[in-house]
Amino acid sequence: MAAESSNPRTVEEIFKDFSGRRSGFLRALSVDVDKFYSLCDPEMENLCLYGHPNGTWEVNLPAEEVPPELPEPALGINFARDGMQRKDWLSLVAVHSDCWLLSVSSYFGARLNRNERKRLFSLINDLPTLFEVVTGRKPIKDGKPSMDLGSKSRNGVKRSIEGQTKSTPKLMEESYEDEDDEHGDTLCGSCGGNYTNDEFWICCDVCERWYHGKCVKITPAKAESIKQYKCPSCCTKKGRQ
């Protein structure tokens, strides 16, 4: 069995597919690592590690059809297993798996427009790579390292742990110059536009995506009175459940 195929079309669907496959890889390289290691017998033929959209993983031979329906992962990951230290081999597999995840997402995203591709890459880039997780450079549960923990809007409103809001304009003004550099690659989850410090932004407490206030019809004054902000997409998902 080769890579399980789905047919995601939208940014959200492609990111969901990416996240599912990534979860499968993470499981193979952490929780199920002993099983994965034993399956990669160097005496076997060219083996590949597949991550599936449902969060499962599989070690198998590559697809027989040429060209394959999806881009293929690295061939022969089993051959190098006994010639390297275990941690180095797992790191190598992680790097190749990162490359495959990006290639599959690029394949599905071929028909997206420029802003949609930027949104998709921004969502993907918010997650630590498999290599970072395997080597311990970043934990599996990773927020944006450049954002203040608990900060939900960029106009100087910071949420405290108790859910209350307090204005910190001086702190934000002092950090605007650095913030431009840190958040320059952040994209609005609605329009796909880049972050600039002269606009009001707000972050969804559920999916943690950032939005222009004008795109989701939230003003700085209204943000002050919101204890937990949910973006339109998360509100819609909850309504369907």
Swiss-Prot record:
This is PHD finger protein ALFIN-LIKE 1. The keyword Coiled coil does not apply. The keyword Ribosomal protein does not apply. A zinc finger (PHD-type) spans 185-237. Its main location: nucleus. The record marks 195, 201, 205, 210 as: Histone H3K4me3 binding. Interacts with H3K4me3 and to a lesser extent with H3K4me2. The modification N-acetylalanine is found at residue 2. GO terms for biological process: chromatin organization; regulation of DNA-templated transcription. InterPro entries: Alfin, Alfin_N, PHD_AL_plant, Zinc_finger_PHD-type_CS, Znf_FYVE_PHD, Znf_PHD, Znf_PHD-finger, Znf_RING/FYVE/PHD. The PHD-type zinc finger mediates the binding to H3K4me3. GO terms for molecular function: methylated histone binding; transcription cis-regulatory region binding; zinc ion binding. GO terms for cellular component: nucleus. It is found in: Nucleus. Pfam families: Alfin, PHD. Keywords: Acetylation, Chromatin regulator, Metal-binding, Nucleus, Transcription, Transcription regulation, Zinc, Zinc-finger. Residues 142-182 are annotated as: Disordered. Ubiquitously expressed. The lineage of its organism: Eukaryota, Viridiplantae, Streptophyta, Embryophyta, Tracheophyta. Signal peptide: none annotated. It comes from Arabidopsis thaliana. PANTHER family: CPG BINDING PROTEIN, PHD FINGER PROTEIN ALFIN-LIKE 1. Histone-binding component that specifically recognizes H3 tails trimethylated on 'Lys-4' (H3K4me3), which mark transcription start sites of virtually all active genes.
